[in-house]
Amino acid sequence: MAEIQDLLTENQVIEGVQNFLYQKGHTTHRRVVTVADAARKEHGVDLVFKLENDKGHGNWYFIEAKGNLKSDGTPMLSKHSTNFRWAIAQIILDIKVDSRNNNYIYGIAMPRSDIEHCKKLIEDNWALKHLRLRLYGAFCQDGKLTAVEYLPKDLYK
């Protein structure tokens, strides 16, 4: 039976989403543009990733991540709903381009164990539906970090 771990640091969540995005899509080029290091408390979007074709056209992913463990591996004191609200605020403040008219995809990544609670927080939120915000649930299975993507059609009523 596969061992699944849902308690992750922010850096592990970022790595899981990055691994997932490398496997996603049919494009020939996948590249990481920026990765923040939570242990060094770097500012800005945590992960900027681009899936592109030979001509450089494609989708830009801007992901804000939150873990349920501190960078030293100890449990977080705040609840997942507080971390999620903080991530929403950060991603909204970082939005520079309307995602409806461009190939910009905004998302929030967190441990998969926190996803169901966060889905309930946003399912009726018109603004987040309008932004087409995605969720990514990171987890570790058999020693490999990966993630599950939750699309807007699955999140909002």
Predicted features and spans:
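Acidic-basic catalytic patches of nuclease active cores, encompassing PD-(D/E)XK
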Residues: 1-43, 51-56, 101
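A structural micro-motif
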Residues: 26, 104, 131-133
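Residue-level detector of flexible, active-site-proximal loop/helix-junction positions
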Residues: 35, 69, 142-144
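Amphipathic coiled-coil/heptad-repeat helices and related helical stalk/stem segments
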Residues: 43-44, 87
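Active-site beta-strand-loop-beta-strand hairpin of nuclease catalytic cores
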Residues: 48-66, 70, 101
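Short, flexible beta-strand-to-coil junctions
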Residues: 52, 112-113, 139-142
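Catalytic cores of nucleic-acid endonucleases
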Residues: 65-127, 136
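Charged, structured surface patches that assemble and position nucleic-acid processing machinery
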Residues: 125-157
